[in-house]
């Protein structure tokens, strides 16, 4: 939980929106994606782990190149002070105007207690994010993301996918629609 501010800033800088590194690299600079994102997802219980989620929507014939490019930026995060400044301002601005209302008030309270926190986590994140630097984001990426083992989920027509390449990433399990949806 002490890492919450760094992770929030990492998510905003690296994988959050159209100004984030993932979108800029995968879609704008390399033309490999219709859409893309990556983020660390916080656990819902204090004994659980964070989960890393990355997504790229690309053409089947660009799959190999897109996976390799995504792995490259995940393991060697591009650093841009200008992009960091934009991300930091966006996160601080959003937190400044966000409000927890309705049933979310009690859900937030209970969620914080479940995590062992007695004050709203948003307060700590808001106060700490304003002092973070690009080096802090890089440190979070080094600790939580870089050089990990990932599970890939590929959705597409098997006839159009390079299954031999997929086998180089690990065991390949081909699922039918019935396997996925149960009918």
Spans of features found by a protein language model:
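Proteolytic maturation boundary segments
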Residues: 23, 134-183
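M16 family metallopeptidases and their MPP-like homologs
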Residues: 1-12, 23-76, 82-134, 147-155
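Structured mid-domain segments that build the active-site/substrate or prosthetic-cofactor binding neighborhood
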Residues: 16
């Amino acid at each position: 939980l002490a890492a919450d501010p760094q992770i929030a800033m990492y998510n905003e800088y690296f994988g959050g929106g159209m100004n984030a590194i993932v979108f800029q690299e995968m879609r704008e600079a390399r033309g490999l994606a219709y859409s893309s994102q990556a983020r660390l997802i916080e656990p819902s219980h204090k004994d659980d782990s964070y989960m890393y989620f990355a997504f790229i929507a690309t053409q089947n014939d660009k799959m190999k190149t897109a996976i390799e490019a995504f792995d490259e930026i995940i393991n060697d995060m591009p650093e841009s002070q200008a992009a960091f400044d934009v991300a930091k301002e966006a996160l601080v601005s959003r937190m400044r105007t966000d409000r927890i209302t309705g049933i979310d008030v009690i859900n937030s309270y209970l969620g914080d207690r479940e995590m062992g926190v007695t004050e709203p986590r948003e307060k700590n994140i808001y106060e700490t994010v304003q002092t973070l630097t690009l080096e802090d984001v890089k440190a979070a990426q080094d600790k939580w993301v870089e050089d990990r083992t990932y599970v890939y989920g590929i959705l597409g027509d098997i006839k159009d996918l390079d299954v031999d390449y997929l086998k180089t990433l690990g065991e390949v399990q081909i699922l039918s629609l019935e396997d996925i949806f149960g009918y």
